[in-house]
């Protein structure tokens, strides 16, 4: 997609796009005509800033060999004349974790969704890709028991052994989910149990989830299926560090 001027770009956005979010590097929109997401690097539109913020098409094409359904990598590049100013990617179903109430989560479904990601974690790791910044870029689609990772353009390539890279990428997505399930809600439960706290800080996600659920179930004297079943354990005084935008 090539735009001849900023005016043409702005007209396209106003006529065909819906605002989704903005971050430190750009603004994300839903493009109705293509049913895709586009991200525009706002700094790339400014001549004086561009020299410090230059992307090239090759920066995005390198992800194409890592075909998967979890990490939504750039598909097509967006140009302003000959300058790369953004990209398009597939639209993820579901809702961002930071917009999702953790009490509503069925833990069995989330476990299944995480297990589904493991093959894709292996795929990107075998392609040398190191992930980054997952807590606010993870989307959960409960109906399909599926996780998606968005805003992937800033991922790097690593010379790390693929098994070590897999462990790192696996840990990143697991830590993101642990934070979502605990922070600002069940901090007291986790911090008061040394075994559980160690799993929260250093353990793999599936082991943590199993023990977390077991301990919550013991506290409330019934099986915890959704975290709402353990809502009596919520620490109402602790707002946590994970910023949530809940309705």
Annotate each language-model stretch with its function:
Residues 1-17:
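A short, low-complexity linker immediately N-terminal to eukaryotic Hanks-type protein kinase catalytic domains
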Residues 13-77, 100-103:
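ATP-binding glycine-rich loop module of kinase domains
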Residues 36, 70, 87, 148-151, ...:
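Protein kinase-like catalytic core scaffold
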Residues 45, 96, 157-159:
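Conserved protein kinase catalytic core
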Residues 48-61, 111-119, 166-174:
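Well-ordered, non-membrane alpha-helical segments in soluble/globular domains
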Residues 69-114:
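Conserved structural core of kinase catalytic domains
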Residues 100-141:
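Conserved kinase catalytic-core helix
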Residues 141-247:
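C-lobe/activation-segment region of protein kinase-like
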């Amino acid at each position: 997609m090539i735009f001849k001027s900023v005016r043409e770009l702005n007209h396209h956005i106003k006529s065909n796009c819906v605002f989704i979010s903005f971050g430190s590097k750009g603004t994300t929109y839903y493009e109705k005509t293509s049913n895709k997401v586009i991200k525009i690097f706002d700094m790339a539109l400014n001549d004086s800033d561009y020299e410090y913020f230059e992307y090239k098409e090759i920066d995005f094409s390198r992800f194409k060999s890592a075909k998967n359904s979890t990490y939504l990598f750039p598909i097509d590049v967006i140009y302003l004349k000959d300058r790369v100013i953004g990209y398009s990617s597939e639209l993820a179903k579901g809702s961002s974790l930071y917009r999702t109430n953790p009490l509503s989560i069925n833990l069995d479904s989330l476990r299944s969704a995480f297990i589904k990601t493991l093959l894709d974690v292996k795929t990107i790791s075998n392609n040398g890709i190191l992930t980054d910044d997952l807590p606010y870029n993870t989307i959960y689609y409960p109906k399909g028991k599926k996780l998606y990772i968005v805003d992937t353009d800033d991922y790097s390539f690593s010379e790390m052994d693929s098994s070590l890279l897999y462990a790192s990428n696996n840990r990143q997505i697991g830590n993101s989910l642990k934070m979502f399930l605990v922070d600002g809600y069940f901090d007291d439960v986790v911090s008061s149990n040394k075994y559980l706290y160690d799993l929260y800080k250093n353990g793999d996600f599936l082991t943590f989830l199993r023990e977390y659920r077991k301990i919550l179930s013991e506290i409330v004297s019934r099986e915890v299926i959704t975290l709402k079943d353990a809502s009596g354990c919520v620490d109402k005084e602790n707002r946590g560090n994970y910023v949530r935008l809940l309705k």
